[in-house]
Design a protein with these regions (language model features):
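Charged, often Cys/His-bearing segments associated with DNA-binding zinc-finger transcription factors
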Residues: 1-51, 55, 477-500
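Trp/Phe/Arg-rich N-terminal binding region typifying the photolyase-homology
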Residues: 60-72, 85-133, 145
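Acidic, metal-coordinating catalytic cores used for nucleic-acid/nucleotide bond scission
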Residues: 66-70, 380-389, 407-408
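Alpha-helical support elements that line or immediately flank enzyme active sites
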Residues: 76-86
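Short, conserved catalytic/metal-binding motifs centered on acidic residues
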Residues: 78, 92-93, 117-125, 154-166, ...
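Active-site- or DNA-interface-adjacent structural scaffold in DNA-acting proteins
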Residues: 108, 112-316
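Basic, amphipathic alpha-helical segments enriched in Lys/Arg and hydrophobic/aromatic residues
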Residues: 279-286, 299, 420-500
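Electropositive, glycine- and tryptophan-enriched low-complexity nucleic-acid-binding patches
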Residues: 318, 326-372
Length: 500
């Protein structure tokens, strides 16, 4: 049984519209909760969001029968809080069980002893999909535009840029990736054998240490700084020998894992869980086979491995090696994300870029943003988004395209880029860096979720969270100004000075 929100209040429960926040607080939690309060108290917005959540998360779940699950509202609140605070599920678990104001937002009163389990939070927040979050984001941005008193006829002026969201991986080398693959292959196989009462892998911990020992030996052979030709040649032969030993040990255990899987398969897989286990182990074995081949080609045969063949994490295979040329940041491991922000500091659209460059997503970003917000007619970019096709295509979509060209400019291009409207929009473009910094502070520095689907969900939730936080910040400032006016109006001395 899952409902959008419990209609019957309990003793001690505070209505969400009546929740009060400390105006002196400078923490992030009150502002994002103020934004969530706005979402809940705006009846048309709340109804539309609940309809989306109900249709995507629990379309066939009974609302009257069965064990109660987390409400749709609580799922959304927990997801937003996790991203806004850039925290893991352990901290979220602590907050939802012991933070009084947050529990009021979740619908729990002072006498309500309901608590949430760690796995409950993890399973339910993961039900949010990127497509669902994108639909909710459109509703939130439209409500935000009403809040800032945007005229229905007012045009939207966008600014577009990309940045890297890192995946949670260690720095990759071919030999440590091979160790990762061997460690998981041996460990998972040993656990399975232990459950089946098979003694093939009684010494699995020693086996893993042996693989690691040979890997460390191969790593240490790289550290020689000898300059004598004979010593260099000798060190090179020792390096090759150490790597060959490492490969031989890895291959021997890889063969043993394969034999064990064959034995278990011949005995018969009992259920679907066993099939999933077998597929998982075979996946790590495939990673190990690839790394053995690449190490052999690079170290022993002296071949340069093409970049397209390299994998930078066996746990997050979608990870890319990105070098944007930033000072002090030679390389970033993750995926690029492109965002488009309007003049009111709301993020209209975003895109996760897989094996794509800025100029390849320029047109799609504008087209998709205009589908969601037809009033968008101006957009600025940096030079990385430039191409001849983009210059032509964007002029069909927008009234003003602020896309600086690369290289020497023609006379016509110079006139375009020196126009007053172009210069004004280009100067305002740097404000998008503030949005990027806000996203990185509130979750998008490193993705904590697993897999490409988890990555997309994490980014979409961060964008929605940022827009809700923006609404909360606007309301927070309005509340402060309102209280300041009340205070001035109530003070007779101030009134007399103003009258004078």
């Amino acid at each position: 049984m899952r409902v959008a929100q419990n209609e019957q209040m309990t003793i001690g429960e505070v209505d969400i519209s009546k929740i009060r926040f400390d105006p002196k607080s400078r923490d992030d939690i009150p502002k994002v909760l103020r934004g969530l309060q706005f979402v809940y108290t705006n009846l048309p917005l709340r109804t539309s969001i609940f309809e989306l959540l109900d249709a995507k998360i629990s379309p066939k779940v009974s609302k009257t029968n069965g064990r109660p699950g987390m409400t749709l509202w609580n799922i959304l609140v927990c997801g937003v809080i996790r991203l806004d605070l850039n925290c893991d599920y352990d901290r979220l678990h602590e907050l939802v069980n012991h933070h009084n104001t947050l529990r009021e937002m979740l619908g729990h009163g002072a006498f309500d002893e309901v608590t949430y389990h760690f796995q409950t939070l993890k399973d339910n927040v993961s039900l949010l999909t990127p497509e669902l979050l994108d639909d909710i984001n459109i509703l939130v941005v439209n409500a935000g535009h009403v809040l800032v008193k945007k005229s229905p006829d007012e045009a939207l002026r966008g600014r577009c840029d990309s940045f890297v969201v890192e995946t949670h991986v260690h720095f990759p080398t071919d030999i440590n990736l091979l160790f990762d693959a061997m460690r998981k292959s041996i460990t998972l196989t040993a656990q399975w054998c232990e459950e089946l009462r098979m003694s093939d892998w009684r010494q699995w911990a020693y086996n893993v240490r042996q693989v690691k020992r040979t890997m460390r030996t191969a790593q240490n052979k790289k550290r020689s700084k000898a300059k004598d030709e004979k010593q260099v040649a000798k060190n090179q032969s020792l390096l090759i020998e150490a790597h060959q030993t490492y490969l031989n040990v890895a291959q021997s255990y890889l063969d043993k894992v394969g034999q064990t899987l064959t034995t278990i398969t011949e005995q018969g897989l009992s259920d679907a869980i066993d099939l999933v286990r077998k597929i998982e182990i075979e996946g790590f074995m495939a990673h190990a086979v690839r790394q053995i081949d690449q190490i052999k080609r690079r170290v022993i045969q002296g071949e340069d491995i093409p970049h397209a063949e390299k994998v930078f994490s066996i746990f997050q295979p979608h990870t890319e090696w990105i070098s944007k040329g930033k000072a002090g940041v030679p390389v970033e491991l993750g995926l690029k994300v492109c965002i488009l922000e309007d003049q009111h500091q709301f993020i209209l659209h975003h895109m996760v870029m897989q094996q794509q460059t800025d100029d390849q997503v320029t047109q799609e970003m504008v087209i998709e943003a205009k589908k969601r917000f037809p009033k968008l007619n101006v957009c600025s970019f940096d030079k990385g988004f430039h191409s001849k096709d983009n210059q032509v295509a964007l002029k069909e979509q927008l009234e003003l395209v602020v896309l600086p060209r690369k290289g020497k400019l023609s006379k016509q291009a110079q006139e375009e880029e020196q126009a007053q409207a172009f210069v004004k929009a280009r100067r305002a473009h740097s404000s998008v860096e503030s949005a990027i910094n806000g996203l990185e502070v509130h979750g998008l520095d490193v993705c904590r979720d697993h897999g490409i689907e988890g990555f997309k969900r994490y980014v979409a939730l961060a964008v929605l969270t940022r827009n809700i936080h923006r609404i909360g910040a606007i309301l927070w400032q309005q509340d402060i100004e309102r209280e300041h006016r009340k205070k001035n109006h109530a003070d007779p001395d101030i009134r007399r000075r103003l009258a004078a």
